[in-house]
Structure formats: structure tokens, C-alpha cells
């Protein structure tokens, strides 16, 4: 039985990790897990061990919100390195979170650890800080990429498919699309996804609540399962139906208003027309503009940019996020252009990410 140390700090990283572990258990059998991950995985996979730290302790967004976690991260890295030196591990799997995982990989190498290091979901060097490329390539043995264009920047990355295509169980078909077109406006189901972090929710929910008054049909507020016990951050949500399964919400919805993040790509792949709305602290936006050189911030639009396609969906940022702009975008939406690009995205990204990574873990 193999033993892995994983670093999955973000909610999305744990969703991807869960699928990888499912694929591994199905194809190769039992395993042991150490490191940083969601405690729910212990019960799901009947693990004897518990995480050194729960992933919830490290969830933050923006340059300012991350600062208080720096000292905790340094302490965690030291403990993780000691763990790898004191116990037999078959591989270290780092998922996303470059601000943590790159220093961790450096610390492992400095300590003389010979355990193979895998990086799954690579840092977005195509957006900013390309200087990290040689550092990443010299501190990780395998770079498992989920973006087809990563190999334009990394010399040794291997594209293994995008995890969302495996995690989404239902996609809209032509019958679903025709059903949406046949509905009157007051019959349509509208989904609101204000993000998963407290800061995102607080900035977007007042606008989303006011916007929701424009719609007479069913209104769904998508709340991540780990936030279901913290509904007070959303304010008065009595007019919404609360659901937590993002792909199912998007499959059911005729249209969605979404905070920037993984959910925007989920909506595109499921086939639900949407508008992206994003508000951050002014200082975060200022710093981002200094370093990030991209036309768009939504993943689906970024993919379209790299492929030389027109943007898939409208994006509204900062003071442009208001009821008037969002409702106007809904009324003027180009559905035909959206659905044409959805088909392109599915072909572009490919299935099989979890299964391919499980195979790498088994063979290492």
C-alpha cells in the first residue's frame, strides 16, 4: 500500500484531490494519506490517519488576506518536511497554491528529501511571474498540467486533461437548450454564485440580492457545502432556494451570475449562459494590474484568448458590477455565440485528468 503526502489548501484543490483518490482506489487499491487536506476525505476513504492541518485553516484570497497566514505556513512547511524525513512516503503531491507549495518544495530539496514531487494544477505563469518557471522545474519531478497551453511555458509539463470534465456528471444537451429558449422570462431559473470566500460574498451579495428582484422565476443561491453552517454571511436570503452542488445548480439554471473562479468554467462546460461579476479590495486590484497582463479574468475567456477565439461571456469588474450593467448583459446575451464556444471548450480541454494522475501516482 502506497503512502502519499498531499498539500491541498483550497476548496477546489480538495474537490480535485477527491476525484484523484477515487480513481486511484478504483484502479490500484488502498493508500495512506498525510499532509494538508479536507478532513472529510478521512471518512470518505476510511483513512486511519488525519491531516496535519485542515485545508480550511489556509483558505484566503487577495494579497492582504494572505498576510496573516504567512507565519502559519512557515510553521506548517517545517512540520511537513520533518514528517517526510521521519516516515516513508512514496510521493509528495502538491495541488495549486504556489505561494505555499513552491516554498515547501524548496524546503524539501534543501532538507535532502529524495521523495518524488508532483505538481498538479500548475501556477499561472502565463498570467504573471514567469520567473518562477525554472524554480518550479528544478524543484518538482513531474508537472501535471490541466491547461493545454502550459507547455508553451514549461519545458517538462505533461497535459493530463482538465479535472472539471471528469467531475461534472451532467452536461446540457440540445433538448435542454431548446427548453431554455422556449421559456418566458418569468419561467426561467436564475442561479447566483457569489463565490466561496467571506470577502467575495460580502461584496457581491448586496448587488445579487437587488438584481434578483428583477426575476420572477425560481432563484437559486449556490452555497458551497462548507458554508452551509455560515449562512449569516449572506444576509437575508429568504427569497432564494439554497443548494450546494454547483454542477447540478448550473444544469438546472437557465442563466447564472457568477463570481470569478472555477464556477465560471463549470458553467461554460455544463452549458449554462452566464455573466462574470468580480469585486476585490482596491489594493488587490492595483497590485494585480501591475503584474497580471491578461485581457480577461474568467477561465473560459482566458482559454478562448489563448486559442484565438472571441470571449465566451461578458465580464464586469469593480465599480462596473452593478444591477444596471448585469441586468442589461442578461437582456442582450448572445446565446448562439455562447453555445458554439462551449462545444469548442470541451474538445480543447479533454477528459481523464483524475485517472491519468492516479496512474502517475501508482507508477512513480
Swiss-Prot record:
Keyword Transferase among UniProt keywords: yes
Known EC number: 2.4.1.182
Matching Pfam families: LpxB (PF02684)
Top-rank taxon: Bacteria
Keyword Transferase (UniProt): yes
Pathway info: Bacterial outer membrane biogenesis; LPS lipid A biosynthesis
Keywords tagged on the record: Glycosyltransferase, Lipid A biosynthesis, Lipid biosynthesis, Lipid metabolism, Transferase
Catalytic activity: a lipid X + a UDP-2-N,3-O-bis[(3R)-3-hydroxyacyl]-alpha-D-glucosamine = a lipid A disaccharide + UDP + H(+)
InterPro entries per UniProt: Glyco_trans_19 (IPR003835)
A biological process from GO: lipid A biosynthetic process
Role of this protein: Condensation of UDP-2,3-diacylglucosamine and 2,3-diacylglucosamine-1-phosphate to form lipid A disaccharide, a precursor of lipid A, a phosphorylated glycolipid that anchors the lipopolysaccharide to the outer membrane of the cell.
Family: Belongs to the LpxB family.
UniProt-recorded name of the protein: Lipid-A-disaccharide synthase
The species this protein was found in: Campylobacter jejuni subsp. jejuni serotype O:6 (strain 81116 / NCTC 11828)
Lineage of source species: Bacteria, Pseudomonadati, Campylobacterota, Epsilonproteobacteria, Campylobacterales
